[in-house]
């Protein structure tokens, strides 16, 4: 794909609005072709390395299925399956894998790791998630939003993110809003706002593209008129137990529930979540939360909202594969 060949995909602000839009158009075409049985393999003979320092369901499956659909082969390197950063430096790992593979996906820790891989690998490197950014998720989110509001431009859409906005999702949403002109509202306690420098940079770009970025602690004001309400988990199994109580106390009033959905005043408002979601007590962590903190109806989102007709989370999950496929095709085929 012209302009993308041999490029890295590390964060959204590395691209222009036009480039982002062309990736979304390619993803929509690849999705339609797959469903109609007309998909053409553009990556036959390509070899792809998937480095996972953090386990994943959606990201791994999306990369593997997308690669297989396009005729490529993959090697999965899990948390215990490589020497990266332990016995071998990131720089050396990049130079080794770059000699053997046509593309490398990295999902793990600091953004500096994926940036170093990109600097030394000599092949396209894709960010499957770092502590700072999650760009492939936002591609899927944007495609899903387009599908559910056909005919509307992004700068005519309002996206609310409720909860902990200081993480990789909050940062990537800021970058997405900057490029698309979304009306993005981060509804969160001030302690959970992203870094001010990134907010300032992205707000200026968003305004140039017809959008706006708002940070507020006021739930009612923040969600008014929203087309989409998005949230993510508040805690993870890797965090100290002491953090759980602190985080839940801080974010409890930002839970996505039927009241919040109604406060939008939009009967067609949709619910988004990057998954996994703790919406019931059917998981190990969900059960712990229910028992220790009384969160029997869900944590960051209630089961009622998650299972409602407003929920489009599984459309999002499917679109991870189509958008990741677009990234690989665009960067590996001429």
Swiss-Prot record:
This protein's name: Ornithine carbamoyltransferase subunit I
Catalysed reactions, as listed in the record: carbamoyl phosphate + L-ornithine = L-citrulline + phosphate + H(+)
Binding locations of L-ornithine: 168, 232, 236-237
Gene of this entry: argI
EC number: 2.1.3.3
GO cellular component: cytoplasm
Outcome (variant: residue 56 to H): Much less active than the wild-type
Listed Pfam families: OTCace, OTCace_N
């Amino acid at each position: 794909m012209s302009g993308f060949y041999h490029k890295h995909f590390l964060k959204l602000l590395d691209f222009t609005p036009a480039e982002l839009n062309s990736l979304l158009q390619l993803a929509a075409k690849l999705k339609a072709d797959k469903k109609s049985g007309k998909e053409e393999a553009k990556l036959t003979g390509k070899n792809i390395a998937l480095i996972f320092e953090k386990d994943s369901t959606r990201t791994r499956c999306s990369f593997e299925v997308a690669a297989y659909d396009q005729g490529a082969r993959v090697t999965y390197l899990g948390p215990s399956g490589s020497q990266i950063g332990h016995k071998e430096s990131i720089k050396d790992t990049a130079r080794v894998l770059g000699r053997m593979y046509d593309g490398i996906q990295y999902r793990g820790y600091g953004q500096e790791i994926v940036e170093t891989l990109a600097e030394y690998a000599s092949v396209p490197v894709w960010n499957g998630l770092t502590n700072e950014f999650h760009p492939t998720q936002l591609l899927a989110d944007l495609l899903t939003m387009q599908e559910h509001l056909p005919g509307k431009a992004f700068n005519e859409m309002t996206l609310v993110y409720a909860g902990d906005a200081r993480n990789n999702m909050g940062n990537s949403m800021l970058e997405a809003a900057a490029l698309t002109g979304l009306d993005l509202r981060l509804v969160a306690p001030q302690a959970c706002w992203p870094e001010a420098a990134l907010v300032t940079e992205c707000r200026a770009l968003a305004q140039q593209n017809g959008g706006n970025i708002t940070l507020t602690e006021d739930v009612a004001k923040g969600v008014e008129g929203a087309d989409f309400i998005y949230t993510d988990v508040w805690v993870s199994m890797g965090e100290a137990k002491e953090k759980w109580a602190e985080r839940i106390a801080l974010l409890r009033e930002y839970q996505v529930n039927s009241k919040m959905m109604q406060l939008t005043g939009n009967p067609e408002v949709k619910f988004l979540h990057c998954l996994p979601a703790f919406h019931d007590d059917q998981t190990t962590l969900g059960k712990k939360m229910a028992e220790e903190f009384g969160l029997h109806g869900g944590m960051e989102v209630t089961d009622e909202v998650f299972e409602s007709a407003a929920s489009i989370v599984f459309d999002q999950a499917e679109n991870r594969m189509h958008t990741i496929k677009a990234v690989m095709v665009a960067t590996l085929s001429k």
